[in-house]
């Protein structure tokens, strides 16, 4: 049974949610949702990448068309964060060095190499491993990495109404605070839950490893943040 205080808290929460989802933001540029260019195989020059990447045989390319096929299904609401982003089938050089193995996916806005230098040819890339494709997890891996891109490109300088003192990024990271897990990785996993077109056996590595679940309220807040910050 609801007590009066619990009912008041619920009504306050619902009212805040309605305000969050209905807030009107002055659009910049065209009113239509901007979209990334349709990915194409020739966007990635694998010969140059092979020559540029130091220390590891990391660029695969055998499943490049599969990766681009998955990239073409990214929801339109997330695409404003992906302007100029290229998708690469392979193992990111810096992540490979750090992990000692090939990461399923990596988002790299700065072009990091295994020698800890950055600014290389693969700046603003999302890498998807061949294993992610072979195991049928590429779509979830891509959404996770796109989540990192959204947080990096859209949430850092965006603010919820009446909460202008703290960025959307920081507010959302607070919702994913955890004693053992990196909240940024948990937040990226939440994009898989919130935006995946399938619901069976989602690949949410960090949620699974740390037995973490995002509440419906947090997922609603995440969707509202994407809507707000992509305008």
Predicted regions and their residues:
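A metal-dependent hydrolase signature that marks the N-terminal structural subdomain at the beginning
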Residues: 2-114, 207-214, 225-231
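Soluble non-cytosolic domains of exported or imported proteins
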Residues: 57-68, 132-141, 178, 182-186
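Residues that cap or delimit alpha-helices
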Residues: 71-79, 156, 161, 165
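Extracellular/periplasmic catalytic domains that process cell-envelope and extracellular macromolecules
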Residues: 79-80, 117-122, 182-186
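Active-site scaffold of zinc-dependent metalloenzymes
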Residues: 92-139, 152
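Structural recognition of the beta-strand scaffold that forms the well-ordered cores
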Residues: 126-128, 149-151, 186-194
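Catalytic Zn2+-binding segment of zinc metalloproteases
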Residues: 146-163, 187
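Metalloprotease/metallohydrolase-associated module, dominated by Zn2+-dependent proteases
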Residues: 166-231
């Amino acid at each position: 049974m609801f007590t009066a205080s619990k009912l008041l808290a619920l009504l306050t929460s619902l009212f805040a949610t309605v305000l969050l989802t209905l807030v009107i933001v002055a659009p910049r540029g065209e009113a239509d949702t901007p979209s990334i260019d349709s990915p194409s195989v020739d966007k990635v020059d694998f010969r140059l990448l092979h020559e540029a990447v130091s220390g590891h045989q990391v660029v695969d390319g055998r499943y490049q068309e599969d990766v681009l096929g998955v990239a073409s299904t990214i929801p339109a609401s997330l695409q404003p964060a992906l302007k100029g982003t290229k998708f690469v089938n392979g193992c990111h050089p810096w992540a490979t060095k750090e992990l000692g193995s090939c990461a399923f996916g990596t988002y790299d806005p700065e072009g990091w190499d295994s020698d800890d230098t950055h600014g290389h040819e693969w700046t603003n890339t999302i890498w998807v491993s061949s294993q992610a494709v072979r195991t049928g997890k590429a779509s979830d891996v891509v959404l996770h990495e796109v989540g990192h891109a959204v947080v990096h490109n859209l949430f850092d300088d965006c603010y919820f109404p009446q909460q202008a003192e703290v960025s959307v990024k920081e507010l959302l990271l607070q919702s994913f605070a955890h004693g053992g897990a990196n909240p940024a990785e948990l937040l990226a996993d939440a994009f898989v839950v919130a935006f995946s077109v399938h619901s069976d056996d989602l690949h949410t590595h960090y949620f699974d490893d740390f037995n973490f679940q995002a509440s419906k309220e947090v997922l609603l807040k995440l969707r509202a943040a994407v809507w707000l910050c992509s305008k």
